[in-house]
Amino acid sequence: MTVLNRVVTGGGADPCYCEVDATGQYVFLAHYHGGAVAVVPIRDDGSVGEPTQVVKHEGSGPDPERQEESHPHSVRPGPENRFVYVADLGTDEFYRYAFDAERGRLQLADGAPLTLPPGAGPRHFDFHPLTDHIYLLNELNSTLSVVDADGGTI
């Protein structure tokens, strides 16, 4: 194995999750203590460039020890690569961003963020392979939420 390069992720402390988009041109990063999501381009040789965008989340939740600020815990592009989703444990919100793959930019989508019950603590999620359902695991209240993303709105 060989390290091709490295870049500063730009989103603050404790990057905790990364995932590559369907085209292989971008990697998305969640920064737990930075309260941010970053979009990083992937070059033709597989190395990475400087972030094209860093989106900062604001807010907090009712748990003073775990939700004192935004804590994006996971970030994933949707199955069609049109949207990027973010579970924010600190704010009890599930974000959806429209993704511009040509420019490597995110824009908050209509109907987002989805606010979950106070103290839920959304952490990880996955997409159903045949429907528009998203299964969202909430760490702090030990629940599983099913989100219907049908029709372009949450």
Predicted feature locations:
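Structural signal for beta-propeller blades
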Residues: 1, 35-38, 92-94, 142-144
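Short loop/turn segments immediately following beta-strands, especially the blade-tip
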Residues: 1, 39-49, 97-106, 147-154
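Beta-propeller fold detector
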Residues: 2-8, 49-59, 106-114
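A generic, well-ordered mixed alpha/beta core segment in the N-terminal half of proteins
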Residues: 4-54
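Beta-rich, blade/repeat-based domains predominating
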Residues: 10-22, 26, 58-82, 116-134
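Conserved beta-strand positions in repeat-built beta-propeller and related beta-rich domains
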Residues: 29-32, 78, 86-89, 128, ...
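Short loop/turn segments immediately following the C-termini of beta-strands
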Residues: 32-34, 42, 89-90, 99, ...
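Acidic, glycine-rich loop-and-beta core segments that form the ion-binding/anion-interacting portion
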Residues: 109-154
